[in-house]
Design a protein with these regions (language model features):
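Positively charged, amphipathic and often flexible ligand-engagement surfaces
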Residues: 5-6, 10-366
Length: 366
């Protein structure tokens, strides 16, 4: 079972990290090479240039899972600033991105979002510092004219993130979308939230940036909801999630005068539906307000074929040292347990992509 193998890899890697076992020799030429752009921004140049051969832009994602200490948080914040500066004026790079939980602590995000207990004086101070870092990243993106994606997090963190993202969009998105909220459409409350974003954008005169994903923490979210006795935030089944996702995309396309959209999915049907919808609405395939996106090393046949057809496409390109990015690779394996059926599809797609490359350039297949 491939998923079982992934879980075995995850468990073995977790143990190896704890005992400081050297893993780079095994990981770097395999998983790391497939899914990671390099250790530094400069190291990603080869991946960026390779993708641009197929008219696919890159979105560099600093994926180090630093400890949530003041030093670790500051280091991640500073590296994210560098990634925004690196993207300035670079037409090969489509967006910058950051994960809010890397510039604060999980505990603070949960307390601020769930409001189950009063924030202490220290909590209030730390949240103010988090807000300052959050807004500083958005300000740097605005100053550099670089669009920035605010990644979604666990349900118990998201309310605080949504509030800051809404605030940042009102401030920085007056003329175009700079700041993008991420909506995990396996949450059944995201369509009402999308409509609130639209109403707010109309009322306050800004362009909302939205990134759509399905979501990757289904088992954990349901388990936590059951343990703490609150309503399950996840759609009842995959069909309901797909319908929610499709509804969000259509709503956004119906109101594109107030939106820019980043569609992050490896689902072939979702990509096809959006491409078809753009053509039906007479929206140019290269309209800068709409981007398709996949992860580096996954669904290349979707990415390259869309780009070849003239649509805007970007790849998330993670970067960090081998050791620091291992938790990201472990999470990829964990997330795949939620979409076990996709594994065989990815293998078929990989075979298709290898065949396509051999036909396009026989030397590349050797």
């Amino acid at each position: 079972c491939l998923v079982g193998s992934e879980m075995c890899i995850r468990d073995s890697t977790s143990i190896a990290l704890k005992i400081h076992f050297p893993l780079a020799w095994a990981v770097k030429p395999t998983l790391y090479k497939q899914f990671v752009g390099g250790e530094t921004l400069q190291d990603c140049s080869a991946a960026i240039n390779h993708l641009m051969k197929y008219n696919v832009k890159s979105t560099l994602d600093y994926s180090a899972e630093s400890e949530q200490t003041p030093e670790g948080i500051q280091a991640t914040f500073e590296e994210t600033l560098r990634s925004i500066d690196f993207a300035k004026g670079n037409t090969n790079l489509a967006y910058a991105v950051f994960k809010p939980s890397t510039i604060t602590t999980d505990e603070l995000l949960a307390k601020a979002s769930e409001k189950r207990e009063e924030l202490t004086i220290d909590d209030v101070r730390h949240f103010r510092e988090f807000r300052e870092r959050f807004m500083a990243l958005c300000q740097r993106a605005y100053d550099n004219d670089v669009r920035i994606l605010v990644d979604a997090e666990d349900y118990c963190f998201q309310d605080a993130i949504d509030a800051l993202t809404d605030e940042a969009m009102r401030k920085f998105n007056k003329k175009r979308a700079i700041v993008f909220a991420t909506l995990q459409m396996y949450r059944h409350d995201r369509m009402p939230y999308l409509r609130r974003i639209y109403d707010d954008a109309v009322a306050k005169g800004y362009i909302a940036g939205v990134k759509f994903v399905r979501g990757a923490y289904m088992e954990a979210e349901r388990a936590r909801a059951a343990a703490l006795d609150y309503p399950d935030p996840i759609c009842k089944d995959k069909q309901a999630t797909d319908e929610n996702y499709d509804a969000a995309v259509r709503f956004t396309m119906d109101h594109l005068d107030r939106f820019e959209m980043f569609m992050g999915t490896h689902n072939e049907e979702s990509n096809y539906k959006l491409a078809k919808l753009m053509d039906e609405k007479g929206i140019a395939r290269d309209d800068s307000r709409v981007f398709f996106a996949q992860l580096l090393g996954m669904s290349d046949n979707i990415s390259f074929n869309l780009a070849h057809a003239g649509y805007n496409v970007t790849k998330y390109v993670p970067y960090a040292s081998v050791r620091d990015v291992l938790p990201y690779l472990i999470r990829r394996a964990e997330e795949n347990t939620s979409v076990a059926g996709q594994t065989s599809r990815e293998l078929r797609m990989l075979e298709m992509e290898m065949t396509r490359r051999k036909e396009h350039n026989p030397a590349e297949g050797r």
